[in-house]
UniProtKB/Swiss-Prot annotation:
Record-listed E.C. numbers: 5.4.99.25
Name the record gives this protein: tRNA pseudouridine synthase B
One GO term of the biological process aspect: mRNA pseudouridine synthesis
Record bears the keyword Isomerase: yes
The gene coding this protein: truB
Active site: 39
Catalytic activity: uridine(55) in tRNA = pseudouridine(55) in tRNA
Originating species: Lactobacillus delbrueckii subsp. bulgaricus (strain ATCC 11842 / DSM 20081 / BCRC 10696 / JCM 1002 / NBRC 13953 / NCIMB 11778 / NCTC 12712 / WDCM 00102 / Lb 14)
Keyword Isomerase on entry: yes
Tree of life domain: Bacteria
Xref: Pfam families: TruB_C_2 (PF16198), TruB_N (PF01509)
Amino acid sequence: MFNGIIVIDKAAGMTSGDVVYKLRRLLKQKKIGHAGTLDPEVTGVLPIALGQATKLIELMHERPKAYVGEGMLGLATDSYDLEGKILAERALSQPVSDQAIKAAMEKLIGEIVQQPPIYSAVRVNGKRLYEYAREGIPVERPKRTVQVFLYDLTAPSQFDPEKGRQTFTYEVECSKGTYVRSLVNDLGEELGLPAVMTKLRRTASSGYKLQDAVTLEELADNLDHAEDYIQPIDSFFADYQQVDLDAALWQQVKNGAWIKLPLDADKVALRYNKTVKAIYRAKGQGLYCPDLMLLSNE
């Protein structure tokens, strides 16, 4: 059984569940889970936990994410992307300046309150929003507070005078739970124009980047060397404070005991034989207790 994290560069047209299903067949193991759903038409970084690494999925969700994408001014849909029903169209008589677009983006940086698109996997009363939408049932979408660390243009925008549409490319860095589709819609509201997301690619998630990723096709063609594409569990904890345990402390940790450490970090990675065996969290006065046990990690 494989243990670790494989970062898949997801192709368009697949759900995150499709990727897990294909990996189970390719790698011939069941214990596999993904960290961070990507919509079918969104491409890019999808971290997949294998074996023992499935214990990390909740922690993986907590890490910031990064995207590059494209949006368009002059059109709005109910899904905030091109998959939805058109709600508004307005031909622009002249382009919006890039300065104005960037200024509107800056207003959406920081802690903001977002409403997810109606076509999203957010649950309300045990049912996903897209299920309500497909059945035509009105439902109040829950608001959530998210963090946007970066929202900026990556190139000059392009104006099509014949269609009265303006396209722009952008980059986003954000916390978990942020909908980039909503950010594009919110940008349009700031500018007083309909806006829709036309493309999106995730470039980083859970601490892993595109350069760490492999496509399913590449993996299938090189199955004899599958291990070459798998990141060790320890790679996820590279930015944690590391503590090497002696034999006595290791015995305590194996038994789930609280231990005393001369540290002030909130969480620490405890290593034995150069391998992370547990994550402990601070309880005050130098005491640390178990947060995540990885005793079988080799």
